[in-house]
Amino acid sequence: MEKVVIVDAIRTPMGRSKGGAFRHVRAEDLSAHLMRSLLARNPALEASAIDDIYWGCVQQTLEQGFNIARNASLLAEIPHSVPAVTVNRLCGSSMQALHDAARMIMTGDAQVCMVGGVEHMGHVPMSHGVDFHPGMSRNVAKAAGMMGLTAEMLSRMHGISREMQDQFAARSHARAWAATQSGAFKNEILPTGGHDVDGVLKQYYYDEVIRPETTVEALSALRPAFDPVTGTVTAGTSSALSDGAAAMLVMSESRARELGLTPRARIRSMAVVGCDPSIMGYGPVPASKLALKKAGLTASEIDVFEMNEAFAAQILPCIKDLGLMEQIDEKINLNGGAIALGHPLGCSGARISTTLINLMERKDAQFGLATMCIGLGQGIATVFERV
């Protein structure tokens, strides 16, 4: 079976969804920008040699509809002979895109794939056009479709206090801002055109969503966002709304050698699981355990984790049940996470994987694990190994 390697991984800055940098930039353009740039950064690879493009996107309507993967590849002037498909596993879409491409390569059905994902939550809101089947409540709790309430459920089940959530959210902003200031994101962020508050076109080199002034005290003053009576989850401890895209160049290790390209990481294992929709945020626990089992590793052997921060109330139970509470500051989301950077749904899987690979390089780490919860009760995880 072919070994699958990542030879490049980049992302756009994360723009605020409400009146932010990408308010006049379409999702297809964010995607095409990354596709063109991956090819420009790796001139040894002919675009025509790409076997397939897998692109994650959740809200596949309006500008994100009608197979945005193909639309973006055509805008990027990738040869018409290269196919492209849009992948949807809700929050895990672009990580699923990576898994789909990896399996094609492992089985020998492909040698080179471009993967990634995008979500413009300013142009296409998460709830746009959604119409849940009225009979769904016979099988799952109605609140299972309300992500904030599933986070409230997890916090109560696992004893996650409001103070713990506020502290974790403040940490996310502080670490993301420190990473920005130190240049830790420089190697993963591709400068991208957007518009400032006056409408002037400029290049953005940094994430617009981070709030460096965030404090536990300020967060503690916010009202509950989903359960106004007994709730503890606020807007400040939830993932920010942002627009962005991320992309990776994936190929067989043998093809990378032939092209003279240096692999940055190898995919060691992959896993996806289902869980109770009412606690959808718990999905990273069984997904991570399954990925670790497939890799022949334990959580203690993983040097760095990237766990998507849908909510502080959601990620803390996952950290606790993976036995990592004492290692948060050494291993978990060292450059902050989605609470500070936002969670553009179809982008996030590729985004956290890109951030993880860069962190592994900076720390000279051997193993890293990226994992996410998924709406309606799923989890997805990938174990990476430095080559």
Swiss-Prot record:
Task: Quote the pathway field.
Answer: Lipid metabolism; fatty acid beta-oxidation
The keyword Cell inner membrane appears for this protein = no
Q: Supply the alphabetized keyword list.
A: Acyltransferase, Cytoplasm, Fatty acid metabolism, Lipid degradation, Lipid metabolism, Transferase
The principal localisation class reads cytoplasm
Coiled coil stretches, renumbered: none
InterPro entries per the UniProt record, alphabetical: FadA, Thiolase, Thiolase-like, Thiolase-like_sf_Thiolase, Thiolase_acyl_enz_int_AS, Thiolase_AS, Thiolase_C, Thiolase_CS
- GO process annotations (BP): fatty acid beta-oxidation; phenylacetate catabolic process
Q: What is its EC number?
A: 2.3.1.16
Which positions are catalytic residues?
A: 91 (acyl-thioester intermediate), 343 (proton acceptor), 373 (proton acceptor)
Which superkingdom heads the taxonomic lineage of this protein's source?
A: Bacteria
- Can you name a GO cellular component term? cytoplasm
Cellular localization per UniProt: Cytoplasm
One Pfam family this sequence matches? Thiolase_C
Q: What are the recorded GO MF terms, alphabetically?
A: acetyl-CoA C-acyltransferase activity
Does this UniProt record's set of keywords contain Cytoplasm?
yes
Q: Which reaction does it catalyse?
A: an acyl-CoA + acetyl-CoA = a 3-oxoacyl-CoA + CoA
According to its UniProt entry, the function of this protein is described as: Catalyzes the final step of fatty acid oxidation in which acetyl-CoA is released and the CoA ester of a fatty acid two carbons shorter is formed.
The record's comment on protein family reads: Belongs to the thiolase-like superfamily. Thiolase family.
HAMAP family xref list: FadA (MF_01620)
Record text on subunit structure and interactions: Heterotetramer of two alpha chains (FadB) and two beta chains (FadA).
This chain's protein is named: 3-ketoacyl-CoA thiolase
Which organism's genome codes for this protein?
Enterobacter sp. (strain 638)
